[in-house]
């Protein structure tokens, strides 16, 4: 284990279908999943309820992977960092986005992103009433 990592979390690269679902949510003023950008060492730079990074999908070839990652929302923490978390005040960004992991970034802690493979399955979270139908379609 990397001793310099304070926390780890899985991420999924968005395929076009998932990207379109995210886009539809935002265009309809629904807040849904979280996306993340990270550095060359896979350490998170920022998490957002918006699609990040910005890019024009029309400029990405149909055979190219999208540069956008969905944060799965599961964490592995070091014990001491959880104790520290309780002492830190909410940052303005955490309050604005409603994302607790931003507190770690604000405190300059390393959040390692681990890319996982959905093996062709659709991954979607239950954030809005409209999500139920999509999730039921996947399950049944």
Regions found by a protein language model. Give the residues of each.
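Conserved core of the sugar-phosphate nucleotidyltransferase
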Residues: 1-88
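Conserved alpha/beta core of the MobA/IspD/sugar-nucleotide pyrophosphorylase nucleotidyltransferase superfamily
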Residues: 47, 60-140
């Amino acid at each position: 284990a990397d001793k310099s990592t304070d926390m780890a979390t899985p991420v999924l690269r968005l395929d076009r279908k998932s990207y379109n679902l995210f886009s539809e949510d935002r265009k309809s003023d629904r807040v849904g999943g979280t996306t993340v950008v990270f550095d060359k060492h896979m350490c998170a730079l920022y998490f957002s309820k918006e699609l990040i990074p910005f890019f024009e999908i029309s400029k990405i070839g149909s055979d190219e992977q999208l540069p956008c990652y969905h944060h799965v929302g599961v964490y592995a923490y070091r014990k001491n960092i959880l104790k520290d978390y309780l002492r830190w005040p909410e940052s303005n960004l955490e309050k604005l986005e409603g994302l607790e992991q931003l507190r770690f970034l604000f405190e300059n802690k390393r959040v390692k992103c681990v890319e996982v493979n959905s093996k062709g399955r659709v991954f979607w979270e239950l954030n809005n009433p409209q999500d139920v139908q999509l999730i039921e379609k996947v399950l049944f």
